[in-house]
């Protein structure tokens, strides 16, 4: 492909490309913002060369649906690069695997994360038990007026829920320390990012040897951690009496392919831990920055459960529309995976009849751009949970709040805010992330006023890797009376 020439009769617009680097000169430390800025100039789908990778960036809801839902089979696979290959054991994982590996792995894993199973007494009791432990830890910090490390605390909370579902144990029962595992997960996500240099310049991997060695070091630590859990599980494994998800995986994989089994577990542990921890951090940050919203949320919670309740249960959550509005608004304005995971076109194709996508093109779904564009949502930079409360009310009477707009997607929030993706390859368990987050944040707000150590608002600009997290901040917990 010649970078600055019209490639095809129905070619889309895009920025000017420089030799070798393409359009990378336009990308900063926050690719989600840089790509969103470009969409305002070049439209809801545009082309950009990222080094030697020909990419197309999509932030138009209709085109997203066309590619990720209607033409799913043509865009099922991921683009290939060295870190994805290393992480996925040669593209055999849930997140980075190709068909047919991905399809088999997804089918096996998803059956354990249905909404029905997640609401079973076995799972809900695990979540409530870990939530009690989280509150105990917070209580210690509150009494002693110590800052609470929200990333580590929420990561440990989420990690223990996943491990209990997966192997019926806490991380404390494993040989690895909690902070080491969490740190390694964080380092892995940095290197999997679309703005890592080895993503755009794979032929220069020799020059990134130090980074790749660091990636391998942390990946090996996580693999060793999962493998040790697997060996411990085997000691008491009874095929006639599966105790947890890993037991079921062992039974399902008749071929005894240990590598695939371990890879699926790694995907679940790594993605599940980081996603929920970052989601909760953003929720807390917005509660701190908008104390009036935090108090309105608190009043809704005590109206449902009273002040004597200490830990909420799942049945309480459905009675709290404002809580749900805060959750969805947090995910709209700061979606945890702002550019999702890219896809690659298997064959030449047309979308919307006249937009040509060539075979081999990398397709980037700009979730951040879609949910933060004034073309699709009123006052996109404002944190307004009320918009979701009103939207859900209107949906019940078949309205979406955009009857007077020329744009059919304007303020149609479910269409323009898709934090977990769409289609067959969306997040494995949005329901799990939602349940964990709603229950934990409501319980935390019920027990504590969330504050920072200063009068200024916390910085709302994100730190980008494959997911986004807030700038480091200190969380102080003031006991409610």
Curated annotation (Swiss-Prot):
Keywords: Heme, Iron, Metal-binding, Monooxygenase, Oxidoreductase. GO terms for molecular function: heme binding; iron ion binding; monooxygenase activity; oxidoreductase activity, acting on paired donors, with incorporation or reduction of molecular oxygen. Its cofactor is heme. Transmembrane segments: none annotated. Heme binds at residue 427. Its EC number is 1.14.-.-. PANTHER family: STEROID 17-ALPHA-HYDROXYLASE/17,20 LYASE (PTHR24289), STEROID 17-ALPHA-HYDROXYLASE_17,20 LYASE (PTHR24289:SF1). This is Putative cytochrome P450 520B1. It comes from Dictyostelium discoideum. The gene is cyp520B1.
């Amino acid at each position: 492909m010649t970078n600055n020439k019209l490639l095809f009769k129905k070619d889309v617009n895009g920025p000017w490309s420089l030799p070798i680097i393409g359009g990378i000169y336009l990308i900063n430390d926050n690719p989600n913002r840089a790509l969103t800025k470009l969409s305002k100039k070049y439209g809801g789908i545009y082309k950009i060369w990222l080094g030697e990778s020909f990419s197309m960036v999509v932030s138009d809801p209709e085109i997203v649906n066309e590619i990720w839902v209607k033409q799913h089979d043509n865009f099922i696979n991921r683009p290939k690069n060295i870190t994805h290959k290393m992480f996925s054991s040669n593209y055999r994982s849930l997140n980075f695997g190709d068909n047919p590996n991905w399809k088999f792995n997804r089918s096996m894993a998803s059956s354990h994360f249905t909404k029905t199973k997640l609401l079973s007494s076995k799972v809900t009791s695990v979540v409530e038990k870990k939530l009690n432990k989280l509150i105990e830890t917070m209580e210690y910090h509150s009494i002693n007026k110590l800052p609470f490390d929200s990333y580590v605390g929420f990561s440990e909370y989420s990690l223990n829920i996943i491990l209990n579902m997966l192997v019926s144990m806490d991380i404390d029962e494993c040989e690895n320390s909690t902070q080491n595992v969490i740190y390694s997960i964080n380092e892995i996500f940095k290197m999997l990012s679309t703005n890592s240099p080895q993503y755009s310049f794979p032929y220069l991997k020799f020059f990134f040897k130090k980074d790749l060695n660091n990636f391998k070091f942390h990946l090996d630590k996580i693999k060793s951690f999962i493998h040790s859990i697997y060996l411990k599980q085997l000691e008491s494994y009874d095929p006639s009496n599966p105790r947890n998800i890993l037991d079921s995986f062992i039974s399902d994989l008749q071929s005894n392919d240990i590598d695939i089994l371990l890879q699926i577990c790694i995907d679940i542990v790594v993605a599940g831990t980081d996603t929920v921890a970052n989601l909760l951090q953003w929720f807390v940050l917005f509660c701190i920055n908008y104390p009036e919203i935090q108090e309105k949320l608190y009043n809704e919670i005590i109206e449902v459960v009273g002040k004597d309740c200490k830990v909420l249960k799942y049945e309480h959550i459905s009675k709290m529309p404002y809580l749900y509005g805060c959750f969805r608004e947090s995910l709209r304005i700061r979606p945890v995976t702002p550019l999702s995971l890219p896809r690659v076109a298997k064959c030449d194709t047309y979308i919307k009849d006249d937009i040509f996508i060539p075979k081999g093109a990398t397709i980037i779904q700009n979730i951040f751009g879609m949910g933060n564009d004034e073309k699709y949502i009123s006052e996109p930079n404002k944190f307004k949970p009320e918009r979701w409360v009103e939207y859900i009310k209107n949906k019940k009477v078949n309205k979406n709040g955009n009857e007077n707009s020329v744009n059919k997607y304007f303020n149609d929030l479910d269409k323009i805010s898709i934090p977990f993706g769409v289609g067959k390859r969306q997040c494995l368990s949005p329901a799990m992330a939602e349940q964990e987050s709603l229950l934990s944040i409501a319980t935390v707000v019920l027990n504590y006023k969330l504050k920072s150590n200063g009068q200024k608002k916390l910085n709302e600009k994100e730190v980008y890797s494959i997911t986004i997290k807030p700038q480091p901040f200190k969380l102080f917990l003031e006991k409610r009376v």
